Amino acid sequence: FNLVRMGSLLSGEARVLMDPHVVNVLPFLSMLMGNYLSTFGVLLLCTQYRALALRRQASQDPLTGLLNRRGFMERCVTAPKQGALVVLDLDDFKQINDRHGHEVGDRVLAAVGAYLAGQEDLVASRFGGEEFVLLLPEGDALAQQTRCEQIRQGIATLPLDGIQVTASLGLVPYARGWHLDTLFGQADRALYRAKRSGKNRVCLPA
């Protein structure tokens, strides 16, 4: 009896679902729930994208697209245990701004940033003004100095509408147990040596 009754109920439900004169709420509810979930998914995706964009904006230099100071410091947390820190400063950049205007100066900075961004073996950042900071991969001091010379020469030959741009670089190789503040102090001293020695060169700390 129960099986017969159950069959009758199921048969009756089937007839109701197939009756064109009867409003079936199940597809409507399903569509409504699907639209809700779809809208929620889009909103969640937009929220995640906005959060990612804000994080990127907080760690990226808007002019060059390189890491800014904050982004570089965050990257240093996962930096290799061995490598080299380089502080790069464009020589006499104030004269470029004074002579050609800040718009041209910005184009120079953007061009240098694009050049550094294209060097896939290093991490490049702009700390502000005409100062850039790089992380070179592991290697001996001679190889790292040679790499810095290549970077210096690459900047000196950038096509900048007749504007000659040179850079001085302070290089500090590091190994296990390095401390970032100490490295920056040594790199700044190396950069000062490069400036004092005539600019447009690579120097190690004294």
Listing of model-derived features with the role each one plays in the protein:
Residues 59, 113-143, 153:
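Conserved helix-loop-beta segment at the catalytic/binding core of cyclic-nucleotide signaling proteins
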Residues 5-14, 18-62, 70-82:
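Signal-transducing coiled-coil linker helices
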Residues 126, 155-174:
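Catalytic core regions of nucleotide second-messenger enzymes
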